[in-house]
Design a protein with these regions (language model features):
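Conserved beta-hairpin
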Residues: 52-64
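A short, internal acetyl-CoA/4′-phosphopantetheine-binding micro-motif in the GNAT/acyltransferase core
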Residues: 80-87, 117
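Conserved acetyl-CoA-binding loop-helix of GNAT-fold acetyltransferases
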Residues: 88-101
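Conserved GNAT acetyl-CoA-binding A-motif
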Residues: 103-116
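C-terminal "cap" of GNAT-fold acetyltransferases
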Residues: 135-163
């Protein structure tokens, strides 16, 4: 293992030890999360105030973020994003699991998402590919479904509790 790899592993371990998904509602945090999404080429045009944004930080910078739009007992996941230097180290899995705990505390029974790049990642997390017409109208009518993500995006669902 090279010195660089060891330093990266140590930095990742430090983040992991203090990582806790936290809601961020203030304007400055929202802007920082939006910048992280942009760095990862993820959509930000329709991140409104009703999108619950969560993240974890390393020092004063966001290292990971995720968003939820809640519709009754289901939620639309908005871009799970990890700082590029931390990608491939398991942080996305941890962030997604933390998001599930938040969702279950809000009595959310299922997640929906759209992806153009992360189908395999989400399959490993228990999501299944579905057709667009299987998504509830309230979620299908969001700008994420109707205009932000391309029609070629893959639609996925995960049941958090038995329906």
């Amino acid at each position: 293992m090279t010195v660089i790899a060891v330093n990266q592993a140590v930095a990742a371990a430090k983040i992991l030890l203090k990582m806790k998904l936290t809601p961020f509602n203030d304007k400055q945090s929202r802007e920082s999360i939006i910048n992280l999404l942009k760095e990862n080429a993820l959509p930000v045009d329709d991140i409104w105030e009703n999108t619950l944004l969560f993240g974890f930080m390393d020092d004063d910078a966001f290292s990971g973020s995720a968003g939820l739009e809640i519709f009754g007992d289901c939620a639309l996941i908005r871009s799970i994003s990890i700082q590029k230097s931390l990608q491939g180290k398991g942080f996305g899995v941890i962030l997604q699991k933390e998001l599930e705990q938040v969702a279950q505390s809000k009595n959310i029974r299922c997640f929906y998402l759209l992806t153009t790049t992360a189908e395999e990642f989400f399959k490993k997390q228990g999501f299944m590919t579905i057709q667009r017409d299987e998504v509830p109208d309230t979620i299908r009518s969001t700008s994420e479904f109707s205009s932000v993500c391309p029609s070629s995006a893959i639609v996925m669902k995960k049941i958090l509790v038995n329906e």
